[in-house]
Amino acid sequence: MIRLLILLLLLNFYSCIEKDIKESNFVGYLVANDSIKIPFDFVFKDSLITISNSKENIKLIRSVDQHDSIKFVSPYFEDYLLFHNHFDSLSGYLHNKSLDRKVKFFALRGENKVVNHENFLLIEGKWKIIFNYDKSESRESEMIISQNKNKIQGTFRTETGDYGFMQGFVGKNKFNLSNFNGYRANLVEAKVYGDTIFGVLYQGNHNVKKFIGFRDDSFNLPDPYAITSMTPGYEKFLFSFRDIEGKIVHNFDKKFLNKVNIIQIMGTWCPNCLDESIYLKSIKEKYKDVVIVSIAFEFAKSKEQAIENLIKLKKNIGIDYDILLAQYGSSDKIDAANKLKSIDTLISYPTLFITDKNLKVRRIHTGFNGPATGEKYTQFKRDFENFLTQLINE
């Protein structure tokens, strides 16, 4: 009788934990190193984790638990969180098997509380950012910030894509921005000296970049339509790869003829590719006669895992056009370019090729700066669809 009572009490205790955790706010942290932790806010509800990144909500879905660990997976990426529940805290790891990557994770019940400083900096606007300014491979970017008192939102635009919706706080002489989308985790910590910024970008536990920034409303990135080129002598984008069902698809198939075509170079591991794929879905719905095909280069170590990743992405976005697997085990751009003889060099995932009805490539768009870039994204969509309409009417 006593044993039964103890068992019932234990079951009731753990069921209370399970019930409570489903409705709770947490602040999560991914450990970049011993002193740096990338924060993100999330909520448990109905077997979902909902991560808040500024204006964006990211869903992670509860999967089959492993022993005494709880598992949450991304609807789009291969990554998953596996952790223990300690009632007021969680502890575990973010895993990506294809990349052999494991990032320590923990979370504390409650909300992210930051002291509201009365003397905070005004940093709203555009900033020219130079990553790795102290190295030979420096790279320019644009930081876009909006501000409400000491709360800030923003992103970084680069010639290959943006860093997603980020949020953070600004104080008397410093600020931070962070996000986590189920795969990519970023943290910016920076100090401000007048119109100059010195900062560091932490990307998970695998990449650190120093940067310097300057206020510059006139700064512009290179034209994304002028970065990638066709191989001399080629006018058409040639390809021949198998789709996720094993059928060979090539550019001279009947369905591509006498149609405007959009060919996307992408990977399921690429957040900017995800944003672009969601946009292309809307294009397909709006322009019924446009033919879209995606060509994937996957990190997954096996063909089976690569196809599984592509099937998951296609299903959860709701894509009804072909996705072809060109490569698995690596997304190396040199190897990729060798499989795509029509292009001189592959600069970025994603890259879009737009052809006319004669299959001639008329434009190449490198990278993707998506919804987090605000007006820049709106302008891109307007220009892209105007050109698409022009090709359709030719």
Where do the protein language model's features map onto the residues?
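N-proximal helix/coil linker or "cap" segments that precede and/or mark the start of modular domains
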Residues: 202-242, 256-258
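Central antiparallel beta-sheet cores of small beta-barrel/beta-sandwich binding domains
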Residues: 23-85, 118-189
